[in-house]
């Protein structure tokens, strides 16, 4: 079963990823959160990577989605995955649905 994450369009959203092996915290060389319209789409709608939306803090990777990432999205479901690379090992940690939900206060209303 795929994980469903709900996000109000134009809001800030964060998620934490903890990587452990035998109870020990691990770091990775690369991490990506990639969002597309559907699984067969070539176009990446937005992507986060270490140093650009993903930070290591207190042994956890914090992935941040900012308002500008989803301001122009339609209210519907998109797909995402979280992938890590460490040395020559590549692993997808999570594949899921990003459901963009209705908003009432639009950016132009924030005066």
Report residues per predicted region.
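Contiguous segments within soluble domain cores/interaction surfaces
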Residues: 1-111
């Amino acid at each position: 079963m795929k994980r469903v994450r709900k996000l109000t369009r134009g809001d800030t959203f964060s998620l934490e990823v903890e990587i452990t092996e035998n109870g020990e915290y691990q770091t990775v060389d690369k991490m990506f959160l990639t969002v597309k319209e559907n699984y067969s789409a070539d176009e990446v709608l937005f992507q986060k990577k270490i140093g650009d939306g993903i930070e290591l803090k207190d042994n956890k990777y914090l992935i941040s989605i900012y308002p500008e990432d989803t301001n122009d999205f339609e209210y519907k479901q998109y797909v995402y995955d979280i992938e890590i690379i460490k040395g020559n090992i590549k692993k997808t940690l999570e594949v899921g649905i990003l459901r963009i939900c209705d908003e009432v206060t639009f950016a132009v209303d924030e005066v």
